[in-house]
Amino acid sequence: MNTSHKTLKTIAILGQPNVGKSSLFNRLARERIAITSDFAGTTRDINKRKIALNGYEVELLDTGGMAKDALLSKEIKALNLKAAQMSDLILYVVDGKSIPSDEDIKLFREVFKINPNCFLVINKIDNDKEKERAYAFSSFGMPKSFNISVSHNRGISALIDAVLSALNLNKIIEQDLDADILESLENNALEEETKEEEIIQVGIIGRVNVGKSSLLNALTKKERSLVSSVAGTTIDPIDETILIGDQKICFVDTAGIRHRSKILGIEKYALERTQKALEKSHIALLVLDVSAPFVELDEKISSLADKHSLGIILILNKWDIRYAPYEEIMETLKRKFRFLEYAPVITTSCLKARHIDEIKHKIIEVYECFSKRIPTSLLNSVISQATQKHPLPSDGGKLVKVYYATQFATKPPQISLIMNRPKALHFSYKRYLINTLRKEFNFLGTPLILNAKDKKSAQQN
C-alpha cells in the first residue's frame, strides 16, 4: 500500500495481564513477535509492528497488561492510555474463562472514555459450549463483542473483517497495496529461492518410434541411447547431462508409450518407470512424428505433462519428410493440442541434427518462466486491472470480490486468489485471468496454476 498520502491506521491491543493480548498480536501479525507465557505481565513495553490484514497495511500495538498490583503498573497504565488515545481502534481483550472483575470493568470504561472506538474481544472461547460464558461480559455495556479463541484460531476472521470495516479500509483499492506488506501475506509458504545451482530435469516423451532416442543423441552428441526402427527399443529411462553455458541440463529418454491394449509385460514396467521419471522432471519435450498425421495417442501422451505440471516444448520431428505443408500441420497442431497453446513449437530432424541448438536454448527460456516469481504488488496490480476491465460475475446476485492475490510456489508458478466467494469463480473467468497473466508476464511453455480461497483458509494455511 502506498502510504505517502495517508497515515497508517493504528490498532492498540489493551487489557489486563495474561488474557491473550500478545497471542492475538502474534496471530494478527502472523509471526511470533511478542513473547507469550502463562506468567502475568510478560509484555511491559509496547510492541509496535506494521502488518497486513487481508492486504491492508495497519500499525498494530501490543501493550503491557494493566494489572493494579503489577510492578511498574502506574507507568504501564499511563503508557497504555496514551496509546489508546492515539489509536484509531482499540481491541480490549478479556479472559472468557474468568468472571469479569470490577477492576477490569473500571479499566475498560476508562479506556472507552478516552477513545470510544473500541471493540470488546472475549478470548479463550474455545468451543460453542463456552459461548455462554461470554454473556457475563454484558456488564461492560458494549452492544457488540467478539468471541474468539486465539489458540484455536476461532473467530479471528470475523474480527479482522470488523476491524477493516471500522477503519473504512474495505474501500481502499487493492492495487494500492505495498509490495513488502503483501510479501508477508504469503505466510512463508513460498520458501526463499535457493541460490545453489539446480540441474534442469528434462523428460523426453512420445509414443514409440517417433525419434526420442535420436533426439537425445543429437542433444548430447553421444550414441548413448540405442536407435532402432524396432518399436520399444528403450525400456529403462536413460539420462544424460550436458552443460549449456554454466547451466546443467539432465535429459531423460523415456520408454515409448503405445496403446494400453498393447502394453504387456516389460512395456508395462517401462511405462511405470516413465511415470516416475516425469515426477522428477521440470520440463517435457513432447516428440511428435510429422512424417504421418497425428493420432489420438499423441494427445493422450501430451496430458502427461499436464498431469505432472511440467513445462513443455513441442518437438515436431522428421520435418524433412513431413506429410503435409507447414500451414496444414500447424493448423492441425493448434486444433488437436489447443490446451497447449502456450507451448513453443520447434521443427527438427533429429537424425540430421537440425535446430538442436534452438531446442537447448528454448529449454533454458522455458525453465526461467517455469521458475518465475511475480512481485506481489505487481501481481495484485494486474489482477485489479483485469477485474476492473471485466468485473467478476455475481453469485446469485451477490457481489464476488478478489481481496488480493499471492504467489505461493514456483516450478510451476502457483497463485492463490483470496476471495469472499471462492466457489463462485467460474472456470471461464479463471481462464481469462490466466490468459491475462500470461500476456503480462510471459509464462512460455509453463502451466499456470490458479486457485481461489477464502480469507479463513488463507489464514490457516
Curated annotation (Swiss-Prot):
Binding site for GTP 1: 15-22, 62-66, 123-126
Positions of GTP 2 binding: 206-213, 253-257, 317-320
Alphabetical list of SUPFAM superfamilies matching this protein: P-loop containing nucleoside triphosphate hydrolases (SSF52540)
Coiled coil: none
Keyword tags: GTP-binding, Nucleotide-binding, Repeat, Ribosome biogenesis
Domain EngA-type G: 9-171, 200-371
GO molecular-function terms, A-Z: GTP binding; ribosome binding
Pfam families for the chain: KH_dom-like, MMR_HSR1
Annotated ranges, domain KH-like: 372-456
Gene3D superfamilies listed in its UniProt record: 3.30.300.20, P-loop containing nucleotide triphosphate hydrolases
Record bears the keyword DNA repair: no
Biological processes, Gene Ontology terms: ribosome biogenesis
Quaternary structure note: Associates with the 50S ribosomal subunit.
Job of this protein: GTPase that plays an essential role in the late steps of ribosome biogenesis.
HAMAP family with a match to the protein in the record: GTPase_Der
Family (UniProt): Belongs to the TRAFAC class TrmE-Era-EngA-EngB-Septin-like GTPase superfamily. EngA (Der) GTPase family.
Protein name: GTPase Der
Source organism: Helicobacter pylori (strain HPAG1)
